[in-house]
Amino acid sequence: MRGKNRPPNAIRRRLRFSLRTLLVGMLLLGLVFAILAAIAGEAKRQRMVIADLKSQGADFVFEDRPAYLPQWLDTEYSRRATYITLTFERKFADVRPLAECQGLEELDLSGTAVVDVSPLAGLSQLEGLELSWTQVSDVSPLGELSNLQTLELNEAPVTDVSSLSALEKLEYLDLTATNVLDVSALAALRNLEYLLLSHTLVADVAPLATLQSLRYLEIYDTQVTDEQAKQLQQALPHCHIFR
């Protein structure tokens, strides 16, 4: 009879357990391969970007090997670049390749030919950005960089800094010799400690009176009057104001 040919319950349970174990093992193996494929894909893209940027004079710093990355996969390209500098590489203008460097924490483009910084808006890990002595005039894309702590725009032709009000973690802002007139938007930067406004046409610094975190302010060669500077100093007794 058919009933006598059926495997005992213990055997059936063992078979079910073995099948479940096999299925779980296959799923885990697939996940591992997917992760390794993603790492390999990112490494390949970064390898191309780095080769291109190195040919233009860039220098790099890479992260330490992540704990999850096997030793045999550890190469310069499998680790994310955390710092890139192209300082005074006058021919460098196109920042689009940098969008592939998602682990980037610091970027120095001072003295380059960069004009458009919109491709940098997706660099969510970026903490420091130097754009001094560039032709960058539109900084609105930088409002997306929520982790940014340092921003240097010395002598860049910037006029509108209202978008920077979204940078809640910003601690250092250099607007020396820019075309900025209105700094009222900066009143939203509650963590700002250093602000450089020298050699600008800024005349009204009253909005900065709410920045209790501010410790250093430069207003040399501005339109700020002695009376305004005095009032600001009274509102911010712990801030060193230089004019």
Stretches with model-predicted labels:
Residues 89-90, 112, 134, 156, ...:
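Conserved "Asn-ladder"/turn position within leucine-rich repeats
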Residues 93-94, 115-119, 137-141, 159-163, ...:
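Per-repeat structural element of leucine-rich repeats
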Residues 207-243:
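Leucine-rich solenoid repeat scaffolds
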Residues 22-37:
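Hydrophobic membrane-insertion alpha-helices, especially the h-region
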Residues 82-86, 107-109, 127-131, 149-153, ...:
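Conserved hydrophobic beta-strand positions in leucine-rich repeat
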Residues 55-132, 149:
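LRR N-terminal entry segment and analogous cap-like coil->beta motifs
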Residues 78, 98-104, 120-126, 142-148, ...:
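Leucine-rich repeat
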Residues 42-58:
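Alpha-helical transmembrane signal-anchor/signal-peptide segments
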